[in-house]
Amino acid sequence: MNECVNKLLHLKFLFYFILGIQKRPVFFVASRYGRSTTYDESLKSRRIFIVPRNEHFFLGSRYGKRSGKYLCLSREINKLIVRKRLRNNDKERTPTLSFITKHFLMRNT
């Protein structure tokens, strides 16, 4: 039984080590906002786990937050804005030679 538990613990350690999810050391913050405090107050300070959050960075996200359903919506809105600008630019653009030629040929056929 003891041997089984040891094997299980060893496998669990290897699993977490391979995945890179092993526990990291804890960083102790002596005072809040970097202000100087007495020793008793610094003991009351909370401990902070400093862990790199690389899994939270995705393309198209802001400030390392996960990209949710709103990312697709914003992309669609951006596409619509670009299309609208292109249509407006076509209307405001002065006719070029190819534009005039196409309309001339279409009128004569």
From Swiss-Prot:
Keywords, comma-separated and alphabetical: Amidation, Cleavage on pair of basic residues, Neuropeptide, Secreted, Signal
GO molecular function, one term: receptor ligand activity
Positions of the pro-segment in this chain: 36-53, 67-109
Residues modified as Tyrosine amide: Y33, Y63
GO biological process: G protein-coupled receptor signaling pathway; negative regulation of feeding behavior; neuropeptide signaling pathway
GO cellular component: extracellular region; extracellular space
Main location: secreted
Signal peptide (residue range): 1-22
Recorded superkingdom: Eukaryota
Presence of the UniProt keyword Signal in the record: yes
Subcellular location: Secreted
Protein purpose: Neuropeptides RYamide-1 and RYamide-2 are ligands for the G-protein coupled receptor RYa-R. May suppress feeding behavior.
Entry protein name: RYamide neuropeptides
Higher taxonomy: Eukaryota, Metazoa, Ecdysozoa, Arthropoda, Hexapoda
